[in-house]
């Protein structure tokens, strides 16, 4: 039953209402408070009106409700109606919300870097001119926080859900985070200050297993809910434990909070289960005390008469109010109804807010200088302005990872360049967990694949390229200095270097040429061999040079079936001792003069005689042979052990195989 409580006053804007017909205020945690006010036409301007032209000035104005000249509710007027029924003049119905409604902006996108959630909430409340009592438990700075297609108020509610923060409007200000000190308890007793009281228990506890992945540490993490009644009073603990056997299977869920350590995950699942089971033990009651509001703490007592002069009283504990309805009638009769949960709870019930589902976004790369050298990039999405940007995000690749032999960068490593346009995806649809799906050409950067889409290419920012041409079936690799490898698709390869080419082989190197080999050197050629040079030529070796010098430190041996030493000018053979041997015949010829000269003694010996003639034999000079090229094709014999021997082939019309032993002089 309501009782008169005369000192109730209402002000809209600068207008104080002299009277009103009724007032109702609905309050709950994690949501706007809503009010409905009914006033007569005199209070709204003029009773003899056909419209609401006078009272329309109240739209958008603040409304303040006072009890005993002390404000207990502040709101904003959002709706006015002229209501008529029957033959009376009617009334004005005024409705609206708590001042938090100023944060009910149109769905918006915004982002912050290196800020705590408390910093973000403080900034948004300042923008909405909403008083704030801030004491967020999560104080770490986050590298990236993103509001995505949400009003400012829904975004704050979502932060409270993700980070398990207390959030409620107490009638005058928004409370974010559990207050450092809860309000002093107000004693409420059934039978005196409470006209009705209901006490309830419900089975809300369910086992869960929460998983997440930390890419920086390459670590999969998961934790089960503790399934213990932390923060619950005795009755709630009994109901908590009674509920668990009904759900033997733990639900698997991803962590909606970005966590970086196993301790963070353990704390998250602890508070998550505490919030989901906060209303396990609850009370609902009615009172006439206008001091109560959402967030008030009450010391609840139950009492009744056991007999004349015998009052039985029992403390039910301290409770915190989470839902409340205030009602004031025309004669200032006041009453309220509320729902409360034990004051020992670790978390309030979760705000009823949906997690946003981020869609693919186009973005521009701002930096690829990952401070950790992990190949990540920072990008700016189209809606991000000023200094807004993502944190360092990973880049999708067709193949990437590590292996036993390759610890990092195994696979395709193609990091977008600054200024590139990329497409972003989002893990679990979370706008704070973007990754690069790939790059996009646009009207100024794309050139297509040529006619018939025949060109496939890979090009770096400096001009290094790999070009595959399906028209002529060719492949070309170029660097920025002009060096190239060209495979023309017809079996030919062209290797070109404007400067130098070096070939290094740690062990062996084989060069196989099926037909001709031509080597052109513009200046000089040097060949250094550590042990032995072995050259096997099937037909001829021809050397053409203006000057030739051979330096042999120890032994020089030339062996041939026939040998010709020919000079157009002069041949000199000089040695401390020189032997010229013809096993059957030795013939020394000069077309003009032959001189045998010795500064010592000349000896001529013939075992069968010595003859002298004054008539010379005729001598036909060998015809000089000239050629321009030589082709060599050889390989080692199968039983080669270092001696002079080969398996060799002549590919003309037939093939013959023969082993030649050159070890005998």
Where are these regions (language model features)?
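Extended, domain-scale alpha-helical bundle/helix-rich regions
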Residues: 85-86, 149-155, 160-342
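Structural signature for extended repeat/solenoid scaffolds and their inter-repeat hinge/linker regions
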Residues: 298, 360-589, 593-597, 603-604
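Assembly/oligomerization scaffold segments
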Residues: 1-106, 280
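Short, well-ordered loop/turn sites that connect or cap secondary structure elements
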Residues: 57-59, 291-292, 416
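Charged- and aromatic-enriched interaction segments used to assemble
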Residues: 95-193, 241, 255-260, 371-394
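Intrinsic-disorder/coil detector with helix-boundary
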Residues: 7-10, 548, 555-556, 563-564, ...
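Short, Lys/Arg- and Gly-enriched loop/turn segments at beta-strand edges
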Residues: 70-76, 305-320, 429-439
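Short, solvent-exposed secondary-structure boundary/capping segments
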Residues: 81-96, 327-340, 372-378, 433, ...
């Amino acid at each position: 039953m309501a009782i008169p409580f005369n000192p109730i006053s209402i002000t809209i804007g600068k207008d104080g209402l002299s009277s009103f017909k009724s007032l109702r205020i609905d309050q709950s945690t994690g949501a706007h408070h809503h009010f409905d006010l009914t006033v007569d036409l005199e209070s709204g301007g003029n009773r003899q009106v056909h419209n609401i032209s006078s009272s329309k000035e109240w739209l958008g104005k603040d409304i303040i409700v006072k009890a005993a000249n002390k404000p207990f509710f502040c709101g904003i007027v959002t709706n006015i109606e002229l209501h008529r029924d029957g033959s009376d003049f009617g009334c004005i119905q005024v409705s609206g919300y708590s001042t938090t409604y100023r944060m009910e902006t149109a769905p918006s996108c915004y982002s912050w870097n290196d800020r705590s959630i408390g910093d973000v909430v403080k900034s948004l409340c300042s923008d909405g001119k909403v008083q704030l009592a801030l004491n967020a438990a999560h104080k770490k700075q986050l590298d990236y926080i993103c509001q995505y297609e949400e009003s400012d108020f829904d975004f704050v509610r979502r932060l409270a859900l993700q980070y398990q923060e207390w959030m409620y409007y107490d009638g005058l200000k928004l409370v974010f985070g559990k207050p450092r000190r809860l309000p002093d308890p107000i004693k409420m007793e059934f039978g005196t200050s409470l006209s009705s009281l209901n006490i309830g228990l419900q089975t809300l506890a369910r086992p869960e297993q929460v998983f997440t992945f930390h890419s920086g540490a390459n670590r999969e993490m998961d934790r089960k809910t503790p399934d213990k009644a932390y923060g619950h009073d005795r009755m709630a603990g009994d109901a908590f434990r009674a509920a668990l056997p009904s759900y033997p299977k733990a639900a698997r869920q991803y962590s909606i909070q970005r966590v970086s350590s196993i301790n963070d995950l353990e704390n998250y699942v602890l508070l998550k289960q505490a919030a989901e089971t906060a209303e396990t033990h609850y009370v609902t009651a009615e009172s006439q005390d206008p001091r109560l509001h959402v967030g008030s703490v009450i010391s609840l007592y139950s009492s009744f008469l056991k007999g004349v002069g015998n009052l039985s009283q029992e403390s039910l504990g301290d409770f915190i109010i989470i839902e409340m309805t205030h009602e004031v009638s025309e004669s200032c009769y006041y009453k309220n109804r509320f729902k409360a949960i034990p004051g020992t709870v670790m978390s309030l019930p979760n705000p009823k807010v949906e997690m946003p589902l981020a869609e693919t976004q186009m973005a521009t790369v701002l930096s690829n200088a990952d401070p950790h050298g992990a190949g990540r990039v920072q990008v700016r999405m189209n809606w991000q302005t000023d200094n807004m940007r993502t944190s360092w995000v990973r880049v999708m690749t067709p193949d990437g990872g590590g292996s036993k032999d390759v610890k990092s960068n195994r696979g395709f490593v193609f990091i977008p360049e600054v200024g590139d346009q990329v497409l972003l995806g989002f893990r679990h649809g979370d706008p704070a967990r973007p990754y690069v799906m790939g790059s996009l050409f646009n009207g100024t950067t794309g050139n297509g694949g040529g006619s018939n889409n025949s060109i496939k290419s890979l090009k770096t920012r400096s001009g290094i390229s790999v070009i595959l041409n399906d028209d002529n079936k060719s492949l070309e690799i170029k660097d920025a200095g002009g060096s190239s490898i060209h495979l023309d698709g017809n079996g030919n390869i062209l290797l070109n270097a404007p400067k130098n080419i070096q070939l290094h082989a740690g062990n062996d190197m084989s060069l196989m040429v099926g037909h001709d080999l031509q080597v052109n050197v513009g200046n000089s050629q040097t060949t250094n061999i550590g042990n032995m040079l072995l050259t096997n030529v099937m037909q001829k070796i021809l050397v053409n040079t203006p000057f030739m010098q051979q330096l042999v430190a120890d032994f020089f041996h030339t062996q041939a079936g026939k040998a010709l030493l020919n000079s157009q000018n002069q041949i000199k053979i000089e040695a401390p001792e020189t032997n010229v041997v013809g096993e059957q015949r030795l013939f020394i010829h000069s077309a003009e003069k032959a001189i045998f000269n010795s500064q010592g003694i000349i000896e001529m010996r013939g075992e069968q005689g010595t003859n002298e003639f004054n008539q010379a034999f005729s001598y036909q000079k060998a015809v000089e042979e000239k050629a321009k090229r030589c082709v060599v094709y050889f390989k080692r014999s199968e039983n080669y052990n270092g001696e002079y021997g080969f398996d060799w082939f002549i590919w003309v019309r037939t093939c013959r195989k023969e082993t030649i032993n050159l070890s005998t002089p």
